[in-house]
């Protein structure tokens, strides 16, 4: 069975595996030590966020994390990428929030293109203060 469902505490280890692997792969322009060094803090903070997981056949293949209307990220397990997992997670977020804002690194054109296809528009450009990397602020608004 395939579904998008709320995060459960038992998902934490798998969600962290996906978070680290996805960040290392998609953001190879950021030193790996940044991601590995931040993993313990992320592990502590994730359960306080609004998380939705994509599960297929009893396995978590991806998740979306939000803080209010801020989409902190959509993370999909490598072999599951390109199969609609991210879109289903984003659809769940859109169903629950009339406005979504996110940041995406300029050097991650695949993610920026995904969000553009899904109706997000660039609202601003800036620099991520934690990594020093150029980033785009993108916004989506539900059409009424």
Enumerate the language-model features and the residues they cover.
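Conserved beta-hairpin
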Residues: 50-62
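Conserved GNAT acetyl-CoA-binding A-motif
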Residues: 95-107
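Conserved acetyl-CoA-binding loop-helix of GNAT-fold acetyltransferases
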Residues: 82-95, 113-117
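A short helix-loop-beta-strand connector motif used in the catalytic cores of GNAT acetyltransferases and
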Residues: 41-53, 70
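A short, internal acetyl-CoA/4′-phosphopantetheine-binding micro-motif in the GNAT/acyltransferase core
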Residues: 70-81, 105
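Conserved N-terminal entry element of GNAT/NAT acetyltransferase domains
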Residues: 1-10, 140, 144
């Amino acid at each position: 069975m395939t579904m998008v469902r709320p995060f459960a505490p038992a998902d934490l280890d798998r969600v962290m595996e996906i978070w680290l692997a996805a960040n290392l792969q998609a953001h190879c322009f950021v030193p790996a030590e940044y991601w590995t060094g931040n993993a313990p803090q992320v592990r502590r903070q994730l359960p306080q966020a609004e998380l939705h997981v994509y599960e297929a056949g009893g396995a978590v293949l991806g998740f979306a994390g939000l803080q209010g209307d801020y989409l902190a990220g959509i993370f999909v397990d490598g072999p599951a990428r390109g199969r609609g997992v991210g879109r289903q997670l984003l659809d769940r977020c859109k169903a629950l929030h009339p406005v979504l804002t996110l940041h995406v690194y300029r050097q991650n054109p695949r993610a920026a293109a995904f969000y553009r296809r899904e109706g997000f528009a660039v609202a601003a450009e800036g620099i991520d203060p934690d990594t020093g990397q150029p980033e785009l602020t993108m916004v989506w608004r539900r059409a009424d």
